[in-house]
Amino acid sequence: MAQLYFYYSAMNAGKSTALLQSSYNYQERGMRTVVYTAEIDDRFGAGKVSSRIGLSSPAKLFNQNSSLFDEIRAEHEQQAIHCVLVDECQFLTRQQVYELSEVVDQLDIPVLCYGLRTDFRGELFIGSQYLLAWSDKLVELKTICFCGRKASMVLRLDQAGRPYNEGEQVVIGGNERYVSVCRKHYKEALQVDSLTAIQERHRHD
């Protein structure tokens, strides 16, 4: 039986690398995969999933108006799909997560979703909220804070490198804009208005 998987983490935990490896594993066995990524995130070019270690794959784009079940069913009828993989799945809508569950339940195709659990305010993304609620399997991909603890929070930095937790939920950016930290240092960085000061304090402890 196919299942719906949600692989979640903070930033820079290797989600895209894990997705590309999973897709390759299917393809190596002669199976066909379909990869999706969010249209909104074009840091590495539109229409592809790229990892920080240099791997990449062509990808279909989804936005808030995409009818994923209809798209996947139509393509599956033309040529069998053995696995659907979705990068940046935090940007899915509630309806799209439901449609992906229908891909699993009605078409018997496994769906593997990779994305962030929470935003820079520590609040769930809509896509992540419903994947946490409806997935068959939840898998945490771990990364670490500068202190060595598990990083479960994401700090957003302004142009001067200061952390802040106000503004729009979605602002696309990489390491210059976001950094993954543990909960303790997330709170401390916001309290003192400086990630650098917290890092310096930790080095001297």
From Swiss-Prot:
<keyword id="KW-0067">ATP-binding</keyword>
<protein>
    <recommendedName>
        <fullName>Thymidine kinase</fullName>
        <ecNumber>2.7.1.21</ecNumber>
    </recommendedName>
</protein>
<feature type="binding site">
    <location>
        <begin position="9"/>
        <end position="16"/>
    </location>
    <ligand>
        <name>ATP</name>
    </ligand>
</feature>
<dbReference type="GO" id="GO:0036198">
    <property type="term" value="P:dTMP salvage"/>
</dbReference>
<dbReference type="GO" id="GO:0005829">
    <property type="term" value="C:cytosol"/>
</dbReference>
<keyword id="KW-0862">Zinc</keyword>
<dbReference type="InterPro" id="IPR020633">
    <property type="entry name" value="Thymidine_kinase_CS"/>
</dbReference>
<feature type="binding site">
    <location>
        <begin position="87"/>
        <end position="90"/>
    </location>
    <ligand>
        <name>ATP</name>
    </ligand>
</feature>
<dbReference type="GO" id="GO:0042802">
    <property type="term" value="F:identical protein binding"/>
</dbReference>
<keyword id="KW-0547">Nucleotide-binding</keyword>
<feature type="binding site">
    <location>
        <position position="145"/>
    </location>
    <ligand>
        <name>Zn(2+)</name>
    </ligand>
</feature>
<keyword id="KW-0237">DNA synthesis</keyword>
<keyword id="KW-0808">Transferase</keyword>
<keyword id="KW-0418">Kinase</keyword>
<feature type="binding site">
    <location>
        <position position="147"/>
    </location>
    <ligand>
        <name>Zn(2+)</name>
    </ligand>
</feature>
<keyword id="KW-0479">Metal-binding</keyword>
<comment type="function">
    <text>Phosphorylates both thymidine and deoxyuridine.</text>
</comment>
<feature type="binding site">
    <location>
        <position position="182"/>
    </location>
    <ligand>
        <name>Zn(2+)</name>
    </ligand>
</feature>
<keyword id="KW-0021">Allosteric enzyme</keyword>
<dbReference type="InterPro" id="IPR027417">
    <property type="entry name" value="P-loop_NTPase"/>
</dbReference>
<comment type="subunit">
    <text>Homotetramer.</text>
</comment>
<dbReference type="GO" id="GO:0004797">
    <property type="term" value="F:thymidine kinase activity"/>
</dbReference>
<keyword id="KW-0963">Cytoplasm</keyword>
<dbReference type="Pfam" id="PF00265">
    <property type="entry name" value="TK"/>
</dbReference>
<comment type="similarity">
    <text>Belongs to the thymidine kinase family.</text>
</comment>
<feature type="binding site">
    <location>
        <position position="185"/>
    </location>
    <ligand>
        <name>Zn(2+)</name>
    </ligand>
</feature>
<dbReference type="GO" id="GO:0071897">
    <property type="term" value="P:DNA biosynthetic process"/>
</dbReference>
<feature type="active site" description="Proton acceptor">
    <location>
        <position position="88"/>
    </location>
</feature>
<dbReference type="GO" id="GO:0005524">
    <property type="term" value="F:ATP binding"/>
</dbReference>
<dbReference type="InterPro" id="IPR001267">
    <property type="entry name" value="Thymidine_kinase"/>
</dbReference>
<dbReference type="GO" id="GO:0008270">
    <property type="term" value="F:zinc ion binding"/>
</dbReference>
<dbReference type="GO" id="GO:0046104">
    <property type="term" value="P:thymidine metabolic process"/>
</dbReference>
